[in-house]
Amino acid sequence: MKLRMWVDALGTGATAGLVAEVLVLRMNPEVTQAMRGVLVGLPLWASWGMLMAGVPLLIGLAIFERFRPREDRWSAPALSMMVFLIAAVLTGVNAKLYALLLSGPAHRVLVQDSVAWGVAVLVAVAAGSLVRRFGNSRGWQVAFSIMMVALPVVRILTVPTPQRQHLEVTAQPLGEPERRLLIIGLEGLDTKVLLVDAASASYPNLTRLREQGARAPITPHRPYLRWALWTSTATGTYPGRHGVKDHRGWDLPLVFSETLRLLPWTPEGSRMILPWGLSKQVPPPPATVAPLWARLDASGVSTCVVGWPGSWGDDPSLQTASSDEVGTALEWTMRASLEAALEPFPERRSQIWSAIVQDQARVEAAVDALKGPVGNVWINLETLSLARRYHEPIRPRDTRERRFLELIMELLDEQLGTLLGATADQTLVAVVSPFGLTPPGSFERLKRFFGGGESWHTSAEGSPDGLFILLGNGIDPGRRVQPARPPDVAPTLCYLLGLPVAQYMDGSVVVGLVTPSFLEEHPLRVVD
């Protein structure tokens, strides 16, 4: 195997690894990026790129050379162009996807990186042409490869990632609310469930939500990150401010002193972008912005939070509902029907049954709180989302799935009835899902046609609209308004509780859900 081939392949791999380091640094502006860590990371990512990209390229070049031998073949310019072109596209995609997850300066530098890699493509073309024309010797070719490796190094050293810490908001009092609050996080709820699946008279409580509640679709921020969306709902801020992005973090102590909160998007997952298996997956850092329930608790309102997704640290309001099946009040005929309906799906039976038991335990805990002195109850239910994800009937012949979903809808309707029946008069009830679920798109279907893809029936990966429903005094029954955003939920609840809206909240009050008389009698108040 020729030395030139080794230089071309491994040099290109090192360039790809260094570009990956730049992208990881850009995605985590809140992490202290000391020069020592950056410099330590350079050889790590360069060698990782040689292994993960350079070695496959070397094998490919060797095979190509065997079938198409040529003495003067020099592949470095074409390979470098390919790396920088992919980097430009990938950086641009991440800049578009994570616009709301990064601070303004960090996002701006990420956009500039996309342009910089485009310029690097032109540099590779020009430099390669000059070497071929005026000095096509081994020394000049090695110098070209060194220059390509140096481009991402120069980029990260001359244009460091702007440091930006997340917004810090402690649980300060907001005042005394005018009424009690029950907010039900119903994961997987969307207009399809409410208007089509729940159209039957068999679901009286879902019918009540549809006919007596005011509703707005919720357009989730992209990309789909479950914890980020639920945290935005509770805090009224976007992930770039509250700091919760993924449901996991990564520690790479050799390079970073803090936990990485976000990895860049790549077509088939980005876990392998961290070098040499030196990283450790850990729970993400907690939200830096206090959720609305914490501010109500600081105002003296007794609070109960059951199962709300996110990273909340040691929040004393959080309760863990016991999922002991013996203590779960699941009516025996419903239990038997669900067990029979799950029999044809052994691969997901245990997972879905655990979710059913867990949700029922959460309902029991929430009902106990509602019947007591607790004035602020938050509960999250996950069974509907899990059942729809793997067993949504999407073809006429999916009769077993259809029967199973009907039972899940019956169970959900009973749980809603139990929760609504435990609320006192004048209680403000909110039902929210910050995202919906949709069947696989054309790309996923194409992957499945060729034997790839996944086995889910519906997914939130495409960021379909969720739903926000309100019940109570001051709500215009049956009203439908334009789509809201996840951060709009918290300020809307503040306003309807007679509390001031915090100025730091990115969302706004969804006034279309409120009656004109309530708007006239309750002027909007804003506090820091």
Where are these regions (language model features)?
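Active-site His/acidic residue clusters
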Residues: 314-321, 361-414, 418
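Beta-strand elements within well-structured catalytic alpha/beta cores of enzymes
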Residues: 174-195, 208-209, 233, 296, ...
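Internal/C-terminal transmembrane anchor helices
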Residues: 136-159
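Histidine-centered active-site microenvironments of extracellular/periplasmic hydrolases
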Residues: 167-171, 428, 432-471, 522-524
